Regions:
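Short, well-ordered alpha-helices that flank and scaffold nucleotide-derived cofactor binding pockets
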Residues: 25, 29, 48, 147, ...
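Walker A/P-loop phosphate-binding motif and the immediately C-terminal alpha-helix
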Residues: 2-42
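C-terminal boundary of histidine-terminating zinc-finger modules
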Residues: 223-239
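Cytosolic-facing regulatory segments adjacent to core modules
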Residues: 72, 81-82, 88-136
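Conserved catalytic-core segment of NTP-binding enzymes
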Residues: 113-215, 220-221
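P-loop NTP-binding site
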Residues: 204, 208, 218, 239-265
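Phosphate-binding loop that captures ATP/GTP phosphates
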Residues: 33-34, 42-91
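Conserved Rossmann-like nucleotide-cofactor binding loop
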Residues: 42, 97, 161
Length: 265
């Protein structure tokens, strides 16, 4: 069974793409087959972290949206490219061409697009997880992605605007009947050590905090040099994100069982 997950944040600069890329690799290390989709179509950047060049992407999501290629043309298997010993990672990237970005902003795309892509990946590539890396904020694209996904992972920094925005985002997702979990990212080290932080924040934002990622300067400086966890598997960041990956597997497995039992009645 394929689980679709949206990685989202209320504001930009919270580390969505960094988290998505590293999370995908860690899920693969746990034996999962993962597809990551750069749905930040107006400002794509996930390919940079994966070290995927424009020459490697013969076609993009933009081409598929406008019927210029087949679905198989836009799915890039980067398992060997990343030298992963287990699992699999597929990448679907967006165009960096200005004219393509302008076109999709002006014309948009079908509201069924997200679900269609997830279903194709499930049927043709047998993936365990489809992860959408979205554009920050509350906009039509985000809501379409949320409506098409099983679970949302909200990244939040520890400042007032982010806390308020994450609470609002979570409440909107609840109205759509969608489950959301929160990861606190770039948390000041002294604050991250507080054992009460997850429960205190959970009460404020009315959502479960499933992980804390302290701020590390080296994460920022490494962004354009590849997936951090692959180069630094023993780093505390990698260890913490691995715990989040395992927790996500537990949570989505529980949700799947609940759905199956409900459907069986």
């Amino acid at each position: 069974m394929t689980t679709t997950c949206v990685v989202h944040s209320y504001r930009g600069g919270t580390g969505k793409s960094t988290t998505t890329s590293n999370l995908s690799v860690l899920l693969a290390a746990l034996g999962k087959r993962v597809a990551t989709i750069d749905m930040d179509i107006t400002s794509p950047g996930l390919h940079v972290i994966y070290n995927v060049s424009s020459q490697m992407m013969n076609f993009t999501l933009n081409d598929y949206i406008y019927n210029r290629c087949s679905f198989q043309d836009i799915v890039l298997d980067i398992t060997n490219h990343l030298k992963l010993p287990r699992g699999a990672v597929y990448f679907l990237g967006s165009s960096m061409k200005p004219e393509e970005i302008v076109k999709v902003i002006r014309e948009g795309y079908s509201d069924k697009f997200f679900r269609h892509v997830a279903e194709k990946l499930s049927q043709e590539y047998n993936v365990d997880y489809v992860i959408f890396d979205t554009h920050p904020g509350l906009n039509e694209d985000t809501l379409l992605a949320v409506m098409s996904s099983d679970v949302s992972l909200l990244l939040m920094r520890m400042d007032k605007q982010d806390v308020t925005g994450t609470y609002i985002t979570g409440q909107i997702m609840k109205k759509f009947g969608r489950i959301s979990y929160v990861v606190l990212n770039m948390v000041p080290p002294n604050l991250a050590e507080s054992p009460d932080l997850p429960s205190e924040v959970s009460k404020i934002i009315d959502a479960s905090v499933i992980g804390i990622l302290p701020f590390y300067e080296e994460i920022l400086s490494h962004r354009s040099r590849g997936v951090f966890c692959l180069h630094h598997p023993q780093h505390p960041y990698s260890s913490q994100l691995l715990k989040i990956a395992k927790r996500l597997i537990e949570l989505t497995a529980t949700e799947s069982q609940t759905i199956d039992l409900t459907g069986a009645k």
